[in-house]
From Swiss-Prot:
Keywords, sorted A to Z: Coiled coil
Segments forming a coiled coil: 75-112
Protein's UniProt name: UPF0741 protein SSP2119
Highest taxon of source: Bacteria
Family the UniProt entry places it in: Belongs to the UPF0741 family.
Species assigned in the record: Staphylococcus saprophyticus subsp. saprophyticus (strain ATCC 15305 / DSM 20229 / NCIMB 8711 / NCTC 7292 / S-41)
Entry keyword annotation includes Nuclease: no
InterPro entries: UPF0741
Length: 112
């Protein structure tokens, strides 16, 4: 089964371009999805990536890559990955809902 990496192009702690290059070098066949991962809290202070739906974070990109390599060596549990995928989707959905409500409130304040 193909590995999948999810990285954020919005968080302060993530250098998307260099991280994407390192992940591609590590596994050229992996699918890499770039976009908001709704992992903003840790993403302010740490670099992170989701590896097969499992979040991994570290203070530096090199430390993160060590964790990614270790994670890729572990046997994959497809049921666990599916559970994590659903959890990640729900987290993104909740963040989108919060953002939508905030925009509505701001729009209402402008019209007053």
């Amino acid at each position: 089964m193909q590995n999948k990496f999810l990285i954020c192009d919005d968080c302060q702690g993530v250098n998307c371009k260099s991280l994407e290059k390192k992940l591609t070098k590590l596994d050229p066949e992996a699918e890499i999805e770039i976009g908001c991962q709704s992992y903003c809290g840790p993403g302010r202070r740490k670099t992170f990536a989701f590896v097969n739906n499992r979040p991994l974070a570290a203070l530096t990109e090199d430390e993160l890559m060590e964790k990614v390599e270790k994670q890729l060596q572990k046997p994959r549990d497809h049921e666990e990955e599916e559970r994590l995928r659903k959890r990640n989707e729900e987290r993104k959905r909740r963040k989108e809902e919060q953002d939508r409500k905030l925009k509505e409130k701001l729009a209402q304040r402008k019209h007053k």
